[in-house]
Amino acid sequence: MSATVTATPKLKSIQRTALAMLVVAGAVNYIDRATLAVANPLIREELGLSISQMGYLLSAFLWSYAFSQLPTGAMVDKIGPRRLLTAGLALWSLAQLLGGLVHSFNQFFAARLLLGVGEAPQFPTGARVVRDWFNPRDRGLATGVFNCASTLGTAIALPLLTFLMLTFGWRATFVIMGVAGLLVAVVWFALYRDPKSVALTAEETAYRTEGDPPGQRTEVTFREWKLLFRFRTTWGMILGYFGCIYLTWIYAAWLPGYLEIERHMSVKATGIAAAIPFACGVVGGVLGGYLADVLVRRGVSPVNSRKYPAAIALLGTSACTVAAAYVTSNTLAVVFISASLFLVYVTSTCAWALSSVAAPTNCTASIGAMQNFGGYLGGALAPTVTGLIVQSTGSFVLALVVGAAIGVVSAASYLFVVHDPITTAGMDQLSEPAARGAIHPA
């Protein structure tokens, strides 16, 4: 790949603005979804909920988020990131606000389902924005930057939400965050523009498309969307991300509860200790994207530069999760959990970077959303399975070991199922009558 075409000052300005807004929106996204986890003990006490009921509440968001991925990815590719993310921000912020007004399990369950639908466009939008505005050799780090919003938001969430809840109460905290999200929606719509709305020079167009396969289409069709499911790489990404997000959501949903229940920490101490692992995740996410770019520049194929780091980091996450389960020291437990989140976010960033090179441009958000669908099926199961295991055994040890085992299987999926990138020519080949029902080897 030639390195002679570089981004012009105008493109760099667009890139910086887009990434900054994606980070802000992503941080709010994760603060909102973490609010229930941080307020877990307070909400259980006020509403009289059991641990297993809290597990169902934590999973409600994840189920609606997971199943909303499939149509959302295609909608981002069809309609564009600007309008879809604006609508998503507005919807999830209203759902967050409603969370502060509930008085029963069923009302809270409905608000969490709505939150999942609203948050669904965030990361498919990020994948499409990176594909639209960055050269392939620069997409890894750009992906790491927007993806770090997930850990940055969670790291900010723990001390911020703890402060807000201790100062104003958990209900006011939900309302405050809902209003903040509505403001972000207005700013995103005002500042971001899709490429078709921006006048670009030939040099700028060359930078954006250099290294991409020829014959790229502009919008995804329903036929192309369906064909993505007939490629082994799509299924490798879906199965691989399942374990990544399962492990992530053990910690995202239960880390505060784990530190309080298993490690007997106070609410105040938990707010500080639980922020450390997610801060490590921010670093891991950015370094994962940087590593993918370095490997591409050293001649590793775009797909392999993503899938191998993703698999290796996921194996490391599983090992550290088992270690965290068995150490007796609270300090060592936080150290191993920090290492787990550092590594799992290396995997997460490499997975999203993979979505920017694994399919044609017009299918970027679609395949990213399919991957995210698989991931959040795992994410939806994690809080419920963890809650049921803890309630049954009285300990988090078995729950963490189960998560680690799932991570090993998903790492194998990245290594052995993800293969070649999906091409427009390959999709056209599968459209022929003779190929009906076949699975493409890519």
PLM features: residue spans?
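Structural signature of the two symmetry-related core transmembrane helices
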Residues: 83-97, 304-322
